[in-house]
């Protein structure tokens, strides 16, 4: 029974190997390899090559997009830097202008204050002169009144009979 199982498992190999069978199987294997190479291997390699080219193109495009993005980023950074410099220049100019205007306003205010002060001094002097003139007038008129009373009194003292 064991012998029958071996024949069944090993087939003809258990009885001996035939040279024609080996050549036939080798020839069929070579034909199979040639057919596989022509109909399976070559198309498979073409597909793999196309896939490789596609992936390489995608990588190249991604690299180009990355370089463009970096270029745009650098341009944006330059624009931002220029914008900041322009802003700083504007702010500095505004500060200078404000300082100049402040100095002009202060100088103008001082000049105006000086003019007002001089006008006030002149007004005070004029009013002082007017007051002095009015005072002289009053003194003169009081002097005349007093003098006339003194003269009248002297006259009445000299003329007791009247």
Curated annotation (Swiss-Prot):
It comes from Bacillus caldotenax. Keywords: ATP synthesis, Cell membrane, CF(0), Hydrogen ion transport, Ion transport, Membrane, Transmembrane, Transmembrane helix, Transport. The chain crosses the membrane at residues 16-36. This is ATP synthase subunit b. It is found in: Cell membrane. It holds the Pfam family ATP-synt_B. Belongs to the ATPase B chain family. F-type ATPases have 2 components, F(1) - the catalytic core - and F(0) - the membrane proton channel. F(1) has five subunits: alpha(3), beta(3), gamma(1), delta(1), epsilon(1). F(0) has three main subunits: a(1), b(2) and c(10-14). The alpha and beta chains form an alternating ring which encloses part of the gamma chain. F(1) is attached to F(0) by a central stalk formed by the gamma and epsilon chains, while a peripheral stalk is formed by the delta and b chains. F(1)F(0) ATP synthase produces ATP from ADP in the presence of a proton or sodium gradient. F-type ATPases consist of two structural domains, F(1) containing the extramembraneous catalytic core and F(0) containing the membrane proton channel, linked together by a central stalk and a peripheral stalk. During catalysis, ATP synthesis in the catalytic domain of F(1) is coupled via a rotary mechanism of the central stalk subunits to proton translocation. Component of the F(0) channel, it forms part of the peripheral stalk, linking F(1) to F(0). It is a single-pass membrane protein. NCBIfam families: ATP_synt_b (TIGR01144). GO terms for cellular component: plasma membrane; proton-transporting ATP synthase complex. One of its GO terms (molecular function) is proton-transporting ATP synthase activity, rotational mechanism. PANTHER family: ATP SYNTHASE SUBUNIT B, ATP SYNTHASE SUBUNIT B', CHLOROPLASTIC.
